[in-house]
A protein has these predicted regions:
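C-terminal cap/substrate-recognition subdomain and adjoining C-terminal extension
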Residues: 73-191
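Alpha-helical substrate-recognition element adjacent to the catalytic core
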Residues: 1-109, 186-190
Length: 191
């Protein structure tokens, strides 16, 4: 059991990155505006949310474990995770996809049949107390109502001033009860 430790479960699409099918209308619109994808891999174009480097520093400084979880299909999840690993998210202790999700009570606007991320699953798989696990997602509908959640704004590549990662780090800092003079406090004091 990882007593005293914390586990952060990151949603992928909309939270850490934004991915589009490389032939999608959204991608064409972004390209017409001069907003170029950070990477194209297979059938997908990826836009990396600003300040991911700060999040990585936060995770290392606080020595917290993390998982990557998408409601996407398993074959696509592998592509998304590989992209995040190339950005430095290579110390995750696991990755999960749609097949690991549960059905919610009410169908959401999604092609996925399973979309709820139950923290009991990852807590049990990795030996954590579920109260020390938190989901970071851009959708309330993908969480269980009685589990820890940071619901962040969905990343939009058009928003050049996106500070979603900074906001996530501030909430995580509070969740884990950090008392150190860590990167979030240093950045907050210099802002």
């Amino acid at each position: 059991m990882n007593a005293g430790k914390y586990l952060i479960v990151f949603d992928i699409n909309g939270t850490l990155i934004k991915r589009y099918h490389k032939y999608s209308e959204e991608l064409k619109r972004y390209e017409s505006m001069g907003i170029v994808a950070d990477k194209v891999s297979g059938a997908f174009a990826f836009y990396d949310r600003p300040h991911l480097d700060v999040l990585l520093k936060f995770l290392k400084t606080h020595e917290v474990s993390y998982i990557l979880w998408t409601t996407g299909m398993e074959k696509n999840a592998k592509i998304f995770v590989e992209h995040l690993e190339s950005l430095g998210f290579d110390e995750h202790i696991g990755s999960y996809s749609q097949i690991d999700c549960k059905a919610g009570k009410y169908k959401i606007d999604s092609s996925a049949d399973l979309w709820v991320k139950d923290l009991d699953i990852v807590a049990k798989d990795h030996g954590f107390d579920v109260e020390r696990c938190i989901l970071v997602d851009d959708s309330l509908d993908k969480s269980l109502y009685n589990q820890n959640l940071i619901c962040c704004k969905e990343y939009d590549p058009e928003n050049y001033d996106d500070d979603g990662i900074m906001e996530i780090c501030r909430y995580l800092d509070a969740f884990i009860g950090c008392t150190k003079e860590c990167i979030m406090k240093i950045m907050h004091n210099t802002a």
